[in-house]
Amino acid sequence: MAQPGRGAIVAVTDHPQLAGSAQTVREHRRSVSRWLGYGACALAGIFWSTGFFFGKIAFQRLSVEHFVLYRFLFACAGLLFIVERPRFSARQWRVLLIASFLGIPVQFLVQFYGLKLTTVSHAALMVGTMPVILAVGATTFAGEHLDVKGWLALAGSTLGMALIISSTSRHVAGGGNRLGDLLVIAAMFFALGWILINQRLMREGHSPMAVTVWGLLTGTVMLAVWVLAQSGLPPIHGVGWRIWLAVAASGLLCTAAATLLWNWGIHQVPASRAGVFLNIEPALGAVLGVELLGDRLGLGTWIGGALIIAAAVVLTTTEKREPEGLVG
């Protein structure tokens, strides 16, 4: 009986030109996948960078609580079609629920309370401290090693954060707010807990997408319970199409689409390079605030922002492990 599979292998190996052609096709496909991966990660970073901008627009008609709830309801609608059947044990469900509580209602309510007080530019630059906070958290709680470059990046990011906060002024329109900046930074520490706990589940064999999506769904349920108990039903009538577009974009683009793009992209590109696209968020977010919302950045803020972004670039371009799945 003929064996087509084996015959094909012999035919290819017996003809160097065919073997070389097959190798060229494989290399071309890998190259295309890699560039598509870079594009997906970059687009995810761009979508994340617009989150504060859309939030400021929504605050014209919605409270912080109702905006965050609407954001995640739209995000859940955008991710429902990829929900996998959960395979968590009872213990893992408890771990996931703790992470979801920190990552969705706590982190995002604190973060957007901060945005309500400060400017888009300041909030975006504060988010730029996340790679450094994550590196320190992984060193402290997960036993990872932070080298000399990492500690220098930590020092630079801390100095930049201090410069931005110290340069805020309540008397200058568009100049930021100290309490708002601090709340955004505090939200990053809740995000740290969320990420580190999720990493435990991923190390136990669960995919980043499964952990991310189920964490988002359960976190949204917790968020809804809190918001409805504290603030009642969100408004539907009289909101205005401009606000609805901002809210929908915040959920569908900044959370659902960015999550899908990032989780696909990081599996197509070298792990040491994917993380650099996280730095699009603070840089582009600050530009959006200045150019579209009239934020005013003093010299201290410009210098501080440059230090934060430089520190994040140093960490993400020298990082050796693969960036984990993220949700924004």
Role assignments for model-derived ranges:
Residues 49, 73-77, 158, 192, ...:
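Small-residue-rich packing faces within the transmembrane alpha-helices of Major Facilitator Superfamily
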Residues 79, 146-168, 188, 223, ...:
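Hydrophobic transmembrane alpha-helices of multi-pass small-molecule transport proteins
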Residues 46-52, 80-127, 137, 163, ...:
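Specific transmembrane alpha-helical segments of multi-pass solute transporters/efflux pumps
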Residues 32-38, 61-65, 69, 88-94, ...:
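Juxtamembrane helix-entry segments on the extracytoplasmic side of multipass membrane proteins
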Residues 58, 67, 71, 114, ...:
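Hydrophobic/aromatic residues within transmembrane alpha-helices
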Residues 68-70, 123-129, 197-220, 251-291:
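Helix-helix packing/entry segments at the starts of transmembrane helices
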Residues 66-77, 103, 108, 112-154, ...:
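Specific alpha-helical transmembrane segments that line the substrate/conduction pathway
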Residues 2-66, 173-200, 219-225, 327-328:
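Glycine-/small-residue-enriched transmembrane alpha-helix faces in small-molecule transporters
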